[in-house]
A protein has these predicted regions:
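Eukaryotic endosomal/vacuolar membrane-trafficking regulators centered on PX-domain-mediated PI3P pathways
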Residues: 43-53
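C-terminal accessory helical subdomains adjacent to catalytic cores in phosphodiester-
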Residues: 1-7, 16-41, 54-189
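Conserved SAM-binding loop
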Residues: 10
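Phosphate-binding/switch region of NTP-binding enzymes
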Residues: 13
Length: 189
């Protein structure tokens, strides 16, 4: 059964985030041609800051669009030295500063926070031990995350996560299941 047209807005820091998310969403059954990517300009200063400051604007666009068509929004931002909850709180503060509501419970708006960064997850998903404080090297090519993302799809589709799964990765799977999966399931009915 095909899914009717859904636009997913992907707000992210860089091409590695984009490649990782596109492969994940495709593996979860979404049409990757229906993803609109808003990515930090490469020479535009802090990518984290760009994503954080762009979030309220894209949230407004999402709220308007969802009245017209089934839509979702996913923001990906590295935790760096902060915690997952710290990054989520920063998004809320950006919305508060613009006097707008952060996220309603029924909104298909997910915030994904790789800790320390996306390379931590890729390293783990490729079968290595990790800790979320260490910095792991970038891939030579963004598309090199294929095996890692395929393993993530298996993890997110399983009922139980392994005990050594990084907490931020578990939180991301939970965020997807809670915020994005209900929209997809409703489109399949």
């Amino acid at each position: 059964m095909s899914i009717r047209r859904v636009r997913i807005v992907l707000l992210c820091e860089d091409s590695q985030h984009e490649a990782f998310a596109r492969r994940f969403l495709g593996g979860m059954g979404w049409n990757t041609r229906e993803i609109r990517v808003e990515k930090s300009p490469s020479a535009g200063g802090s990518a984290e800051q760009w994503v954080r400051e762009r979030f309220p604007k894209e949230l407004n666009v999402y709220r308007h669009r969802r009245q017209l068509a089934a839509s979702a929004m996913i923001a990906i931002i590295d935790a760096d030295a902060k915690g997952v909850n710290d990054r989520v709180r920063e998004f809320k503060e950006e919305c508060d500063a613009r006097q707008m509501k952060f996220r309603y419970p029924d909104e298909a708006v997910a915030i994904v926070v790789p800790k320390r960064n996306i390379e931590t997850w890729i390293h783990y998903l490729n079968g290595n031990s990790v800790n979320e404080q260490e910095t792991y090297s970038k891939l030579d090519r963004e598309r090199g995350c294929r095996t890692a993302v395929d393993n993530l799809i298996k993890i997110c589709n399983s009922e139980a996560v392994k005990s050594d799964t990084p907490p931020a990765l578990t939180a991301a799977c939970d965020e997807y299941k809670k915020r994005i999966m209900p929209l997809r399931n409703s489109l399949l009915e």
